A protein has these predicted regions:
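Transmembrane helical cores of multi-pass ion-transport proteins
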Residues: 25-443, 447, 542
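Active-site-adjacent beta-strand anchor residues
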Residues: 99, 527-528, 553
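Short acidic-hydrophobic, aromatic-tinged amphipathic segments that line or gate anion-handling sites
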Residues: 547-562
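Short, positively charged and aromatic/hydrophobic N-terminal segments
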Residues: 6-22
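The feature marks cytosolic C-terminal regulatory regions of anion transporters and related permeases
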Residues: 383-541, 545-546, 564
Length: 566
């Protein structure tokens, strides 16, 4: 109850900051919870209850592991999942989003804590929360599409590497002579400390990894990470193995989260401002990406602006109640959907169950071996790395996109996300401007002959055919313009691309999603008049072969003839 009494004034301040005219047009900031409750029923509540409990069980070991990877205490991970998880579900723009600490923040949070302490982290997170609220109020939810696919793929893979490097010490039971902050320094210290490897710790870590790999193949309901925690804790405790546990390194608290105002100074604000911006951008990208994945799974559409406001409120409250940055978690959101969650109530139940865990079971967290925590984070890093996508982009993309991907990846590993995202975006923009400059020189482009393409202003289109014409270059900022399928009685979709001079990997990824959507709806996709550069990208990526050469036609008349055959 104290938590709600503290947070309500914050919501009131947000309301006062919005002009009267803006409040009259606030439907774009309507939480999905209100819509869900309009036709809520006992059956839906039971589904949300079951799903919320299961997701809480999944979130428990992850929240503890991610807290430790972030350089904070185990209970702070639960504080984050409870406070931010509840508020983001209650106020969010998605029906099924589950929020909490995620691996994406681990390295940046650990760096802030090492340099500026917990007060610095709290200030950075509050500032990030305010930025997210402003982004939502100013309807900037759609702006996230301007982050290229290559950058998100690059920094996600880079974050995965930093997590693995950061957990090598605990997995191998090593003793470091100093406490390095940067990833490169951690790797150097690991190599210098190889003589301190604890083989018993390695065995426990390998057992935890094996459980997480093998268990899901036979049992889906009980999370493998929880099984790994229970088995390794019992083994280390029962056999008195010489392996560090959480209790050996941290003092476990069962206190509920309480309001704590951080010490704020100009120096602190100036020091953490770049980190705050990075947290805000990362939270926006991760949460909206999770929403998109959820939309595809449940066939709904989220409210991106309301989601950003909820992320802002959740992160602000998390910081003030002792937590760390939070965002939508794709794995937990997918688990919520698969286990029957149908409304934001499931996320709120998940937070409530974690409160009970914090009060009743948290002392047992002291028994969890550190190699098991490292093994859990290894699996998190593997699952988030998207290494197959990473390699596919390198093999199939234009050289400019590959350059952006590799620059972002290496800068994330060697420096941090602040540098990686900034340099990656700058490079992507410069390469895009070069590409557009090349397009402007008409004689340098070889266009497919469009013979008999304009025999008449209007062409008869069969009733079972949809025709879309795309104009202008298709790059990362225009990928969202790719149409979605509204089938009805339609069996063929023609994309007329005579006015598309250039295509990048982000837009190609959008076309691939459209192709998959067409296949799900049994709609044939046909391309008309694809120019040289887009055709080269499609062939190099294998997309041309997937769609079939017979479905690429030189002009609209030939495309309509193909449609008549289907």
């Amino acid at each position: 109850m104290k938590f709600f009494l503290h947070i309500l004034p914050t919501l009131g301040i947000i309301n006062l900051c919005v002009s009267k005219e803006r409040r009259e047009d606030m439907n774009y900031l309507k939480p999905q919870l209100l819509e869900s409750l309009a036709d809520y029923s006992k059956e839906k509540f039971l589904k949300d209850l079951v799903s919320g409990v299961i997701v809480a069980i999944i979130a428990l070991p992850l929240s503890i592991a991610l807290a430790l990877a972030s350089g904070v205490t185990p209970e702070q991970g639960l504080y984050t999942a409870i406070v931010a998880g509840f508020l983001i579900s209650a106020l969010g723009g998605s029906k099924v989003q589950i929020a909490g600490p995620t691996a994406a923040f681990a390295s940046i949070v650990a760096g802030i804590v090492a340099r500026n302490g917990m007060d610095g982290l709290a200030v950075a997170t509050v500032m990030a929360g305010i930025l997210l609220i402003l982004m939502g109020v100013l309807r900037m939810g759609s702006m996230i599409k301007f982050i290229p696919y290559t950058i998100t793929t690059g920094f996600t893979a880079g974050i995965a590497v930093t997590i693995v490097v950061g957990q090598l010490k605990d997995f191998f039971g090593m003793t470091y002579g100093r406490s390095p902050i940067e990833t490169v320094e951690k790797m150097e210290e690991f190599l210098h400390s190889l003589d301190t490897v604890n083989l018993t710790a390695v065995a426990v870590g390998c057992l935890a990894l094996a459980i997480q790999i093998i268990w899901p193949r036979f049992f889906q309901k009980i999370p493998a990470s929880l099984v790994a925690v229970v088995v390794t804790a019992a083994l280390v405790r029962g056999l008195h193995l010489p392996v560090n546990t959480i209790g050996d390194l941290y003092t476990i608290s069962t206190d509920l989260p309480h309001l704590t105002i951080p010490a704020v100074s100009y120096d602190t604000v100036a020091a953490v401002l770049p980190d705050a911006c990075t947290i805000a951008i990362l939270a926006a990208i991760e949460s909206l990406l999770s929403c998109v994945v959820a939309d595809e799974m449940i066939g709904a559409r989220h409210n991106s602006n309301m989601e950003l406001v909820a992320q802002g409120v959740g992160n602000t409250a998390s910081a003030l109640f002792g937590g760390i940055p939070a965002t939508g978690a794709i794995a937990r959101t997918a688990a919520n959907i698969k286990n029957g969650g149908v409304s934001p109530v499931a996320g709120m139940v998940h937070a409530g169950v974690l409160v009970l865990v914090l009060v009743l079971l948290m002392p047992y967290a002291a028994l969890i071996p550190m190699p098991c925590i490292a093994a859990i984070l290894f699996m998190v890093a593997y699952n988030m790395s998207g290494w197959r996508t990473f390699l596919r982009v390198i093999r199939q993309s234009p050289k400019s996109d590959t350059a952006v991907l590799l620059f972002t990846f290496f800068l994330t590993v060697v420096f941090d996300l602040v540098v990686a995202i900034g340099v990656g975006l700058t490079l992507a923009c410069l390469l895009f401007m070069k590409r557009m400059a090349d397009v402007a020189v008409v004689h340098e482009w070889e266009y497919v002959e469009d013979t008999q393409d304009d025999q008449g202003r209007f062409k008869p289109v069969p009733a079972h055919v949809m025709v879309y014409e795309i104009n202008g270059p298709m790059f990362f900022g225009a990928a969202e313009k790719i149409p979605h399928i509204h089938t009805g009685e339609k069996r063929v979709l023609i994309l007329r691309m005579r006015s598309v001079p250039a295509l990048d990997i982000t837009a190609l990824n959008g076309l691939r999603r459209l192709w998959e959507e067409c296949r799900r709806h049994q709609v044939q996709l046909v391309f008309s008049h694809v120019n040289q550069q887009p055709m080269s990208v499609m062939k190099k990526s294998g997309f041309y072969d997937e769609v079939g050469a017979e479905n690429f036609r030189p002009n609209i008349d030939a495309a309509l003839e193909r449609a008549q055959e289907l």
